[in-house]
């Protein structure tokens, strides 16, 4: 039986904007109030996803969230018609309106944590949506995320969907952005690496001083329990608090893994050598490649600006690994030099492919942010909603859909335009028909 690691990319929503909502994310803050292009952003994302499908990889798409989120605005006291709710929020609480208009669900690395059937006791693929409690604009996503995941992976024989963790900072969970999996083959049992920023219940444990640690050890342990993982298939690693304070808000900004390769920065973790030894021990003597990037070659700021580690490492059909990198990596002298050297070092990584995802990058999300990885066998892949899998037909339909419904430009002041509600809902209603998702949105209930 064939085994794959499918990437499910987030489709950029119609309200993609630069509101600077993500404290701790340097790119997000630096581009606050810039004019965005929802149409360009969506097309850049689709182009990247289609390119991976054309490389022979399993590739799907996840639908965006409904924005503006009038349901949340009504929950916090704004009343009247939809237009009146929007108008009141714009005048009385513009920051809350911006939070309720974010298209941040496009970064599906934060949508959920996924454990494949090879690792779980019941032999099913487990999904737990991330609660994302650290950021208001993302904390309103999990319920709809769960709906979309259930409509995409819609066969209970193969897929087990959990509710998101309790909505409290002690269980702060940011999903797959703080999780990676090492294995010899996608279909073999692997080691799941859970990276956390702090221990919520231990006030004496190290934690960052400037920026928040969004993932807790307690959340990571809860996910491992829910997903029926045993101790031998789980490793819990603390991210270096110092790099969080330098803008490394998720682990996928400082490390990335694929099969038997862990690619990480020298400063990424606490107790690095001890944890690498634990991984090696649990890998039972099979070949592992730890690729450590020294600070002397790539500093933390260059890593963050270029998103060197927010790249995707994929295994091509010929068995070689390739890095899927943003063009920003080409534009950074130190990073570009390192990547050119990397492919000559005798590791499994032999190629680098560059993609323009600047609309996403300016909001603080690179190629790895845009995808949720799901390792599966051919039977499980066949059980996925076929209308969510990338091919020529879906690519063309979604591009036409974007062209029809998305604005070329969107300024922050445009978020108060009632017409944006109509445009967004019309687009999403049509999208649920294209992808055959059913009624996953609040306005469709």
From Swiss-Prot:
Active-site residues from the entry: 174, 250, 369 (nucleophile)
Enzyme Commission (EC) number? 3.5.3.23
Keyword Transcription carried by entry:
no
Signal sequence range: none
Any Pfam family from its record, for instance, is: AstB
Any one biological process term the GO annotation gives: arginine catabolic process to succinate
- Record's catalysed reaction(s): N(2)-succinyl-L-arginine + 2 H2O + 2 H(+) = N(2)-succinyl-L-ornithine + 2 NH4(+) + CO2
Q: Which UniProt keywords apply?
A: Arginine metabolism, Hydrolase
Q: Where does substrate bind?
A: 19-28, 110, 137-138, 214, 252, 363
Which InterPro entries did the record assign? Answer: AstB_sf, SuccinylArg_d-Hdrlase_AstB
Taxonomy, superkingdom: Bacteria
Pathway annotation from the record: Amino-acid degradation; L-arginine degradation via AST pathway; L-glutamate and succinate from L-arginine: step 2/5
Q: Name one GO molecular function term.
A: N-succinylarginine dihydrolase activity
Q: What does this protein do?
A: Catalyzes the hydrolysis of N(2)-succinylarginine into N(2)-succinylornithine, ammonia and CO(2).
- PANTHER family named among the record's database cross-references: N-SUCCINYLARGININE DIHYDROLASE
What family does the entry list? Belongs to the succinylarginine dihydrolase family.
| Quaternary structure and interacting proteins, as annotated | Homodimer.
Would you tell me the protein name for this molecule?
N-succinylarginine dihydrolase
> What gene is behind this protein?
astB
